[in-house]
Curated annotation (Swiss-Prot):
The chain crosses the membrane at residues 9-28. It comes from the Bacteria. It is a single-pass membrane protein. It comes from Aquifex aeolicus (strain VF5). It is found in: Membrane. The keyword Transmembrane applies. Its main location: membrane. GO terms for cellular component: membrane. This is Uncharacterized protein aq_766. Keywords: Membrane, Transmembrane, Transmembrane helix.
Amino acid sequence: MKIPRGIKIILRWVVTLYIYGFILYQITPFSYFETYIPEERLAPKPYVERIFYLFGVKSNEYPSKEVLEFLKSMDVDLVYGFFPFEDYGIFKNSLKAPECHLIYTSEISTFHRILNFLFDYVPKKITGNETRTFHYFIKPKLGKCNVIVQDVYLSPNFLDFKLDHSRNMVYKRLWEDLQLEQNVITNGRKSVDVYAYSTKSMYYPSESTIYPFKLYAKSNEEKTLIIVYRDGKVYRIYDERSTVLKINKPGKYSVKILTYAFSWEGYYFGLRTIAYSAPITLLY
């Protein structure tokens, strides 16, 4: 069957525009960073549980097998939301929101969702590769506790696109209740760690101390940028998968972890936010 010349021209333009759009999407956003050399890279391992949870989800019925299997693949421990049934396994009806800045996934623009669907989700699904999260469009409030509110319905259709391996994480000491204010936003499948320690104790996001401490941050992503904020302003930047930073100046120290596609002469392309922690505070 012979394709008309006009159709060929249209197809050629569509393919060309798609290729340019794909390349542009993968290399943006980009930024210039001056990085530091880590003082140390290893830290003592804390004796705590890492609890991964979703907050604000919705469901009209008991979760299906597909939903449960997907949540298991995300290592989700708890689902706080609004359900027409009493507590059911990891599902807990939620009435009170944590005292944090709430980031609603529904606020991500349709334009950004379409870009992600066309230039990341579709091509990587076709090739069998892991898709990147579109939740990097979410902007956490610096120097604050942030919680992602997954205000979506848990239905099997496009579940991996709706949740996109975006979760909240808290450290829980075995003898303490769960404190959602001690939150770390996590995007993607890779694990992250953000905590601090001194000769006196271990400290986790949203905690404070009068003792100088060492701040530890780690990601399992291959290409990682770790940005440390002091009182909401950039304090240190590391092009490393893990770092330890000595903290002696009073202030609120939070950590943002990004991944990138490639770097050149201090410019980092294809930046994606994969974690942001509530601050750890040195009082004085």
